[in-house]
């Protein structure tokens, strides 16, 4: 019984760590994106998650909700995880950049890619999340995440699905960001890209089983 209690207490301490990080990040002003973002969008998921998914930055829906991957790309991601046989409860989701970078276009807020300064300013938060969660696998979603975590020279279009050696986790790889699937020009193209995306996720699931 004592061992069980110690495990529970250790898990509670770990949870407090991520909660503290979230509270600290809420007031982050390391770059200027806080001036136009509604709020900091920190990572979400259990401390015991075995898989960490890292995207580029929150989108419009995420910025308003204060939670990552709750918009259309998040819905597509949830579907792909389910089809790949990955339990969503075992996944921690976050982004390299914690504020929504955008430009106005009419009444809409359109995504803008974060620059190197903004990415560098946010990297300590991501590193802290990785240290707290200690995932077995990290999946970078899109080129921004892959180049920030794996290598500035990483090409998702060429190297997607390949495992790379990293001190961050036992398994580290990259695939496309789900938003890129939504932007595919035809239904057929979307179907094909979705299938490839699911295949990439399935490969991770088989590796960590």
Residue ranges with predicted function:
Residues 2-209:
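A polyanion-binding, active-site-adjacent surface
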């Amino acid at each position: 019984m004592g061992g069980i209690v110690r495990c529970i207490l250790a898990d509670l301490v770990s949870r407090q760590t991520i909660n503290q990080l979230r509270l600290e990040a809420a007031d982050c002003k390391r770059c200027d994106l806080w001036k136009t973002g509604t709020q900091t969008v920190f990572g979400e998921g259990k401390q015991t998650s075995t898989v960490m998914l890292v995207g580029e930055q929150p989108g419009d829906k995420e910025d308003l909700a204060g939670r990552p991957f709750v918009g259309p790309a998040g819905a597509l991601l949830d579907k792909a995880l389910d089809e790949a046989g990955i339990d969503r409860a075992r996944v921690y989701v976050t982004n390299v950049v914690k504020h929504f970078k955008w430009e106005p276009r009419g009444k809409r807020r359109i995504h803008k890619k974060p620059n190197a300064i903004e990415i560098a300013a946010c990297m300590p938060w991501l590193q802290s999340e990785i240290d707290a969660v200690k995932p077995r696998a990290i999946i970078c979603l899109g080129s921004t995440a892959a180049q920030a975590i794996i290598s500035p020279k990483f090409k998702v279009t060429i190297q997607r699905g390949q495992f790379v050696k990293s001190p961050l986790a036992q398994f580290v790889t990259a695939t496309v960001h789900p938003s890129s699937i939504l932007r595919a020009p035809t239904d057929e193209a979307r179907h094909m890209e979705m299938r490839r995306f699911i295949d990439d996720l399935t490969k991770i699931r088989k590796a960590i089983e």
